[in-house]
Curated annotation (Swiss-Prot):
Entry keyword set: Aminotransferase, Mitochondrion, Pyridoxal phosphate, Transferase
One MF annotation (Gene Ontology) recorded for this entry: L-aspartate:2-oxoglutarate aminotransferase activity
Coiled coil: none
Role: Plays a key role in amino acid metabolism. Important for metabolite exchange between mitochondria and cytosol.
Subcellular location: Mitochondrion matrix
Family: Belongs to the class-I pyridoxal-phosphate-dependent aminotransferase family.
Miscellaneous remark of the record: In eukaryotes there are cytoplasmic, mitochondrial and chloroplastic isozymes.
Listed cofactors: pyridoxal 5'-phosphate
Main location: mitochondrion
EC code: 2.6.1.1
Name of the protein this chain belongs to: Aspartate aminotransferase, mitochondrial
Subunit and interaction comment: Homodimer.
Length: 28
């Protein structure tokens, strides 16, 4: 992702860790 979020959480999008959009991805 490219929204500049500094979170490091599991993300389905990256099949691992998404450093810049995990919160938004999870909330969807």
């Amino acid at each position: 992702d490219d929204n500049g979020k500094p979170y490091v959480l599991p993300s389905v999008r990256t099949c691992g860790f998404d450093f810049t959009g995990a919160v938004e991805d999870i909330s969807k």
